[in-house]
Swiss-Prot record:
Knocked-out gene: effects: The null mutant fails to remodel the LCV with endoplasmic reticulum (ER)-derived vesicles and is trafficked to the lysosomes where it is degraded. Mutant is defective for intracellular growth in hMDMs, amoeba and for intrapulmonary proliferation in mice.
Subcellular location: Secreted; Host vacuole, Host pathogen-containing vacuole, Host pathogen-containing vacuole membrane
Name of the protein this chain belongs to: Effector protein MavE
CDD domains found in the cross-reference section: MavE
Outcome (variant: residue 77 to A): Does not significantly impede L.pneumophila replication within hMDMs
Membrane topology annotation: Single-pass membrane protein
Organism: Legionella pneumophila subsp. pneumophila (strain Philadelphia 1 / ATCC 33152 / DSM 7513)
Assembly notes: Homotrimer.
Segments crossing the lipid bilayer: 184-204
Domain notes: Contains a C-terminal transmembrane helix, three copies of tyrosine-based sorting motifs, and an NPxY eukaryotic motif, which binds phosphotyrosine-binding domains present on signaling and adapter eukaryotic proteins. The NPxY eukaryotic motif is essential for ER-mediated remodeling and lysosomal evasion by the LCV.
Purpose: Virulence effector that is indispensable for endoplasmic reticulum (ER)-mediated remodeling of the Legionella pneumophila-containing vacuole (LCV) and lysosomal evasion. Essential for intracellular replication in human monocyte-derived macrophages (hMDMs) and amoebae, as well as for intrapulmonary proliferation in mice.
UniProt effect for mutating residue 102 to A: Does not show attenuation
This protein's UniProt keywords: Host membrane, Membrane, Secreted, Transmembrane, Transmembrane helix, Virulence
Domain of life: Bacteria
């Protein structure tokens, strides 16, 4: 499951959705999130992807690396910006759109790469989870963002969405004791706990 495949997937779907129903005038956009039906695998995939997204957007070096990986140096190429999914994309600067797009692609790639030699069934599940994240959650992640600090708003939206996804996943798990270890169902996140802890110190600091 290579990063190249991931980039092809993201750029190939850039025109597939209209974000009008997630505009700033919509009341409580998280209502749509609660109505999205998904499997436990897909929910787990999203939780891990959002954790990576928050970390990448919180650490300058990781964001720079994400931009480099995603664009392969082609910083001005508009096909690398998933504008059709970003809420009120016309109001975003090119720089913010590029940063967000690179970060979300890197996050999905990092989670996808954890599945070594996936079966055809797993590949389909990964593809489905990616579709849900890009089609349904990117508009939510980018809704009601501060024009002066888009990425901070995205991180805050991501944190809220992730908490709701975790709460929903807990409801689906028959044995609550499994959650005594908060990372037991999210093994990919566990590998980034140290990085996330560092990122937390700058999450609401001077980071753009």
């Amino acid at each position: 499951m290579t990063r190249f495949i991931m980039l092809s997937f993201v750029t190939g779907y850039r025109k597939s959705i209209s974000c009008n129903r997630f505009s700033r005038n919509v009341v409580s956009p998280y209502f749509f999130m609660r109505t999205i039906i998904m499997t436990r695998f897909e929910r787990n995939f999203l939780i891990n992807s959002l954790m990576f997204l928050e970390t990448i957007l919180s650490v300058d070096k990781k964001l720079d690396d994400a931009i480099h990986h995603f664009t392969q140096g082609q910083y001005e190429n508009p096909r690398y910006q998933i504008n059709s999914r970003i809420t009120n994309a016309d109001d975003w600067s090119k720089e913010d759109k590029l940063k967000f797009t690179s970060a979300i692609a890197e996050a999905i790639a990092l989670v996808s790469e954890k599945y070594e030699n996936p079966t055809s069934e797993t590949t389909e599940q990964i593809q489905s989870a990616r579709n849900i994240l890009l089609d349904n959650y990117v508009p939510l992640l980018t809704a009601n963002t501060d024009p002066e600090n888009r990425l901070k708003s995205v991180r805050e939206n991501s944190s809220q969405i992730r908490k709701e996804l975790i709460a929903k996943l807990k409801d689906e798990v028959p044995y609550k004791s499994q959650f005594e270890n908060p990372y037991v169902l999210f093994p990919f996140v566990a590998a980034t706990v140290a990085v996330a802890a560092t990122a937390a110190s700058v999450l609401f600091g001077n980071k753009p």
